[in-house]
Each structure stands twice: as structure tokens, then as C-alpha cells.
Amino acid sequence: MFVLYINDLKKTLTKAQLNLFADNTVIYVICDSFRECYEEMNDELKVFADWLKLKKLNVNKTKCMVVTTRSRNDCNGVVQIDGEIVERVDAIKYLGVMLDEMLNFNEHVNYTIRKAARKFGVLCRINRYLTFDNKVMVYKTLIAPHFDYCASILFLASKQQ
């Protein structure tokens, strides 16, 4: 039902690209200059804020973030939504994948390794109490899914990772 409610959003934004999945929305622009990107994004976010008001929806401003693929030194603009500045971050988690400003997925690889290592630590602590079959089941249940989800990204890991 929610998808039907927000289906016209794609037609509302003219300069920005939009990715929708369930209640997750990503709005992004691709431009040649940094100034142009900030201008287009701010223009589109004004349209987006008006659309939200029309639909009687609120944006969760604590989950709004800006990631750019340029160095911080090149970036001195601000993105605003409904008069509030949107936080600029180095990486975001989107649908379980860490996206960083370099788009090299190092952040995601490290994030996946940390999550799996914590679960492996649990397995090591209870190791002596489990049969071989139970160990395999715990591995397949707790650890393997971290490597299976978006596995193709993990192939981008550097040799030291």
C-alpha cells in the first residue's frame, strides 16, 4: 500500500535520480561540477519537501545524509531539506551495504568482516559444548549469511583484507 502512496514521487523529481525499496528512498544527482550538484540537490529537495507536505508525510531527518564522491576539500556547499542542514558523512548503510565516498566498498568489506568475526567469537566460546553437526549449523546460521549477502562486493576486497 505504501508503494502505491509514493509511486508518483518519481514523476515529481525532474533532475534527481530516485531509488525506492520498501520505505527506503535514495535521491541522488550526477553532475559535472560540485556547485551544480548542490544546486540541483537543494532544488529537488525543496520539491520533495513540498511533495511530502502534500502527502502528509514526514521525513526522518535523523536518517537523511549526504555522501559525495569528491574529497572534502572540494566540498563547501550545504544540502538542506525543509530548512535543516543535512549531515555530510563518509559512508552510509543502504539495504545492508556500506557505501563510501570512494565507492570502493572497503568500508563494506571491513563492516562484514567485523560482524562475522564477532559471531565467530561466539562460536569459539561455545565450541567445546557442540557436536560437529551443531558447529556446522551454527556457522551456517550465524556466520555464513554475512558473507553470502552481496557476496560479489566482497570480491572487491584488497589483498590485505
Which stretches of residues belong to each language-model region?
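Short, conserved micro-motifs composed of acidic
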Residues: 43, 57-90
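Hydrophobic alpha-helical membrane-association signature
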Residues: 1-5, 41-44, 112, 119
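Short, conserved non-catalytic motifs in the polymerase core
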Residues: 1, 28-34, 79, 83, ...
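Beta-strand cores of modular interaction/reader domains in eukaryotic scaffold and signaling proteins
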Residues: 19-21, 26-28, 58, 80
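Catalytic palm subdomain of template-directed nucleic-acid polymerases
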Residues: 26-53, 70, 104, 156-159
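Short beta-strand/turn micro-motifs at beta-sheet edges
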Residues: 14-16, 84-85
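Conserved pre-motif C helix in the palm subdomain of viral-like polymerases
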Residues: 1-15
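Non-catalytic, peripheral interaction segments enriched in hydrophobic/basic residues
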Residues: 14, 21-22, 53-72, 94-161
